[in-house]
UniProtKB/Swiss-Prot annotation:
Protein name according to UniProt: Coilin
Keyword list, A-Z: Cytoplasm, Meiosis, mRNA processing, mRNA splicing, Nucleus, Phosphoprotein, RNA-binding
Cellular compartment(s): Cytoplasm; Nucleus, Cajal body
Positions of the UniProt region annotated as Disordered: 253-309, 382-433
Single GO MF annotation: RNA binding
Changes seen on gene knockout: Leads to abnormal trimethylation of U snRNAs, and defects in pre-mRNA splicing including of genes involved in quiescence, and abnormal Cajal body integrity. Leads to an increase in cnp3/CENP-C protein, lagging chromosomes and abnormal mitotic and meiotic chromosome segregation. Leads to an increase in the RNA level of genes involved in meiosis and rRNA, and a decrease in the RNA level of genes involved in cytoplasmic translation. Decreases mating and sporulation efficiency.
Assigned protein family: Belongs to the coilin family.
Biased composition (Low complexity): 260-292
Functional description taken from the UniProt entry: Component of nuclear coiled bodies, also known as Cajal bodies or CBs, which are involved in the modification and assembly of nucleoplasmic snRNPs. Required for proper pre-mRNA splicing.
GO cellular component: Cajal body; cytoplasm; nucleus
Biological process per Gene Ontology, one example term: meiotic cell cycle
Length: 626
């Protein structure tokens, strides 16, 4: 079996072997012939060889080596898409043509061409081995990488329960794109208080935060009740034991403790003395506080958790964002906090104010109080922030549908007013002007025309169709040829003639039969005088396996055309308009699709095709009738 190698216009510069006119695929000494033989065998013999030569866009993604080459198989002058079963057409004596396509054309018809990527000819054997090994191991590797549903569920649950952090020491909160409430609030903050912007100076800070987050949430959920003053020191030791302190924050806390307690300013230089001064300050504050002692104690425990270490501030801020609070639940407290940490304040925010920093986005607040985090009544699932009960009047309609409710009421009022106008005898013009005035600028732009009336264009089109049907019937009755003055017949048709039932028109049209214009004479295929039977200009009808004009896929179809040139072996025919290919042109007027072989553009545009007499069947000669 021979394989011709050719190239489409314009020529594609592909390796030296592409200039070979034909290759004998039975010669195994040639590496190129061996490779092409394996390609043909893979596509024609039921995937016996299992080589990794694929077709289409999926195969383009699988190759990364060598130059890209688009090939197309052709037999008897027409292209064969790879999706066909080529075993029906291949024989030992067949000659296939392997056409090299340009890249743009190959990408346009990626499902119909072979895609080949080659390195230098010396590495073809190695490439074949690599392709085959990758193809055999691709499915096995995919099965190993797939996760079971149980494993995926566990990973999903673990990802939701724990905060995520990256390997580059950048903390990522649960709420990704949450806008900050004010940039000025964070402008004067210390370096350690900057959220999600600075890298940590401690290498294992991520692991420490990860552990502290779980331990603090667990501890706060178990101790949601009131924390007394005696248990305050235990709570401080439990949280500070799992969190690493940073020296810059300790210096900040010691400076604040100096201002609050001057008697203990000398002993606040070290880390231990700072914690003692903070605890003593908090205990003195709790003794002198007025009002409810339980709420003050809970507030002191939260502020003590913040002042004892620096990491707990970021932990409480980020972990509180995992919860979604209903809008308006803590409205009074949030208003008080906004007044405390206003953007116009010249002094930097204190540690206690930082613990209540929140975003402007509703229902996404930061709380460090354990009572607020563990409250069952305030915990709401995501997507359910709006928990306000709808009113009884509009309980069936949500807020986004308020416009539709108003439009419905407006529509009902308009209909009611139109009925009243009918009863009072208002003219149609007045009603139309009234409706236009009411619906002018309306959102929905409701049309008040009743269904079935149609526009003036629709009525005119229906009238033209009726006139055309009547004209055909008049032409059939008179048996006259159409002339230019017969156009007046349509205009002079009375209106009563146009108002007949459509059933009569359809019955009369069903009886119409177009008389054949040509008489076909079959021509025997055994005769060798085709060039004498079909002179130039004669009409012929034949059956051939050619490309579909629309889908460009091979099919057996009947075609009709006029003979342009004829010889003993081939015939050149100008096909009818319905049998020509649907060509596409670029901005320069050149054909960009459906180019096969070396057919010139002039013949493609004119619909001229060349066939061998041996490929035609059911050949008929057409002659005009008298």
């Amino acid at each position: 079996m021979l394989l011709k190698v050719s190239s489409c216009e314009p020529l594609v510069p592909i390796k030296q072997w592409i200039h070979t006119s034909q290759l004998d695929l039975s010669d195994s000494s040639s590496l190129v012939a061996d490779l092409l033989y394996n390609i043909i065998k893979f596509n024609f013999s039921g995937l016996e060889d299992k080589r990794a030569i694929f077709t289409g866009y999926e195969s383009i993604k699988r190759y990364t080596i060598g130059n890209e080459m688009f090939l197309q198989l052709a037999k008897d002058g027409f292209a064969l898409p790879v999706s066909m079963s080529y075993g029906l057409f291949l024989e030992e004596t067949d000659t296939l043509e392997l056409r090299a396509l340009p890249r743009s054309e190959g990408l346009h018809r990626g499902c119909e061409v072979l895609v080949l990527r080659l390195d230098s000819p010396n590495e073809l054997k190695e490439n074949i081995r690599e392709w085959s090994s990758k193809f055999m191991n691709s499915k096995a590797s995919q099965k190993q990488q797939m996760l079971s549903p149980e494993t995926m569920q566990k990973v999903d649950l673990a990802g939701r329960a724990s905060p995520r952090y990256q390997a580059n020491d950048s903390w990522i909160s649960k709420k990704r794109n949450a806008p900050l409430s004010s940039i000025s609030q964070y402008a004067n903050m210390p370096e350690n208080y900057a959220l999600n912007t600075k890298k940590s100076k401690i290498s294992n800070e991520n692991d420490t935060i990860f552990k502290a987050n779980f331990q603090q949430n667990k501890y706060e959920s178990l101790h949601a009740k009131q924390i007394s003053a005696s248990d305050l020191s235990l709570h401080q030791e439990f949280v500070s034991a799992s969190i690493v302190q940073q020296p810059e924050l300790n210096s900040l806390l010691t400076s604040q403790s100096k201002n609050s307690t001057p008697s203990e300013s000398d002993s606040s230089s070290s880390e231990s003395s700072s914690s003692v001064s903070d605890s003593s300050d908090l205990s003195s504050t709790s003794d002198s506080s007025s009002g409810d002692e339980s709420s003050d104690t809970a507030r002191q425990s939260s502020s003590d958790t913040i002042s004892s270490n620096n990491v707990s501030v970021s932990v409480s801020l980020n972990t509180a964002n995992e919860f979604s609070f209903p809008q308006g639940t803590f409205k009074a407290e949030n208003e008080a906090v906004e007044s405390e940490v206003a953007p116009s304040s010249s002094t930097p925010p204190t540690v206690e104010e930082i613990s209540y920093l929140h975003y402007d986005e509703p229902s996404q607040y930061y709380f460090s109080s354990p009572s607020k985090l563990s409250s069952e009544t305030t915990k709401v699932h995501r997507g359910c922030e709006n928990t306000e009960k709808p009113s009884e009047e509009g309980k069936n309609f949500t807020t986004p549908l308020s416009d539709s409710v108003e439009s419905e009421n407006t529509w009902s009022n308009t209909l009611r007013s139109s009925v009243e106008d009918d009863n009072t005898g208002v003219s149609d013009d007045n009603k139309k002007s009234k409706l236009n005035a009411e619906f002018d600028g309306h959102v929905n732009n409701i049309s008040v025309r009743p269904p079935g009336s149609g526009s003036s264009a629709t009525k005119a089109r229906n009238l033209r169709r009726k006139k055309a049907r009547i004209l055909k019937r008049l032409m059939q009755e008179s048996n006259d040829t159409f002339s230019a003055n017969e156009s007046t017949v349509v205009a002079n048709v009375p209106d009563s003639y146009l108002t007949k039932n459509d059933e009569e028109d359809s019955a009369s049209l069903a009886s119409l039969k177009v008389a054949p214009k040509y008489v076909s004479h079959p021509v025997s295929l055994s005769s060798n005088s085709f060039h004498t039977e079909f002179p130039i200009g004669s009409l012929m009808r034949f059956t051939v396996m050619d490309l579909n004009p629309v889908t460009c896929t091979p099919e057996i179809s009947e075609k009709t055309g006029r003979v342009v040139d004829c010889s003993e072996e081939k015939v050149k025919i100008q096909l009818d308009l319905g049998d020509r290919l649907d060509l596409k042109f670029d901005v320069n007027g050149e054909v960009i699709r459906n180019r096969y072989g070396t057919t010139p553009d002039e013949e493609l545009i004119e619909g001229i095709a060349t066939y061998e007499w041996s490929s035609l069947s059911n050949v008929h000669k057409l002659e005009l009738t008298n």
